[in-house]
Amino acid sequence: MALIGANGAGKTTTMRAISGGIHPTKGRVVLDGKEVQGLDASAIARLGLAHSPEGRKVFGPLSVEDNLLLGAYSRLPRFLGYRAKASADLDRVYDLFPKLRERSGQAAGTLSGGEQQMLAIGRALMARPKVMLLDEPSMGLAPVIVQEVFRTISRLKAEGITLLLVEQFAKSALEVADYAYVMERGRIAVEGTPAELSRNERVIAAYLG
């Protein structure tokens, strides 16, 4: 599912409200049949939701691998053997992003923008989420890296992970989504399948022209 709209439309705020970063004043957030709008972010993460935020938000001084391990923190007991219990998840992320394996001991803050985006997505995957929020995964990246990121998004979708994608490149977002919403001034203005939105004159003029 994709959420598109101009800067300031409320997309990132919506993502934060879903993931527990802020608490909505109205409405409900339902995850797997359970209302979660009053829970904090860590409790929502334990229920199976992971958030790859706008701007990546990696922990610069920590190594790539330590950043990834933090993603598993919500679901694994904190005792001796924690790293070993997460080894299969690390291998999965490294298979998706071989560059991260090469740089596993490197400080995350020294990575390129594209590598940091891979790390942010990988960190979210370490939680084994049922639902994954991706906020502007292509922001600031070179076109060739954007293509790689969207190939990964398509692969995650094929694996059965439910994805909510906020993306500045509306055309790319519609190519991977099954359904999409257009947000304007904090409200849903248009919604439909990618095929329907691609024929909508209002959407074409504002986002696809």
Write out the residue ranges for each language-model feature.
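Glycine-rich phosphate-binding loops of nucleotide-dependent enzymes
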Residues: 1-209
